[in-house]
Amino acid sequence: SGSCTVKTCWMRLPTFRTVGNLLKERFDGASRVIYGNKGSNRASRADMRHLEPEDPAHKPHSPQDLVYFERSPNFCAANSKVGTAGTTGRACNNTSLGLDGCDLLCCGRGFRTLTERVTERCHCTF
C-alpha cells in the first residue's frame, strides 16, 4: 500500500536579543499621549482609541507603538523626592560610548579630565 508523510511545524520564539532589540527600537520611538476629548479619566481598553498624541503634529499611534503618559524624571539632577542621587561628581570613561561614557553620564554639563601617574613595582626580571 501507500506511504504517508507527516510534517510537523513548531512555533518558535525569537531570540532574547531579537526581542530586546525590537523593544529598544520601539522605546526610542515612543511618544507621549493624552486623553482625547472623547476619553474618560480612567484608562480602559475601550478608552485606548481615545488617546491622542500630545503634539498634534505627530501621527496617531498604532497598536504596536509604545506610548507613555508621564515624562521620566531628570536622572541627571539629584531628586530626594524620587530617590535619585544625580550624576554630578561621578567618574566617567571619556573613551566609552556606553552608559559609563562622559557624554551620557555628564548630561551635557562638561567634565574635568584627571590624569594620574602611578608608579608600581612590577617584579620584572631582565
UniProtKB/Swiss-Prot annotation:
Disulfide bonds join C92-C107. Palmitoleoylation is required for efficient binding to frizzled receptors. Palmitoleoylation is necessary for proper trafficking to cell surface. Depalmitoleoylated by NOTUM, leading to inhibit Wnt signaling pathway. GO terms for biological process: canonical Wnt signaling pathway; cell fate commitment; neuron differentiation. Glycans are attached at N93, N94. It comes from the Eukaryota. Pfam families: wnt. A lipid is attached at S1 (O-palmitoleoyl serine). InterPro entries: Wnt (IPR005817), Wnt1 (IPR009139), Wnt_C (IPR043158). GO terms for molecular function: cytokine activity; frizzled binding. Keywords: Developmental protein, Disulfide bond, Extracellular matrix, Glycoprotein, Lipoprotein, Secreted, Wnt signaling pathway. Ligand for members of the frizzled family of seven transmembrane receptors. Probable developmental protein. Belongs to the Wnt family. This is Protein Wnt-1.
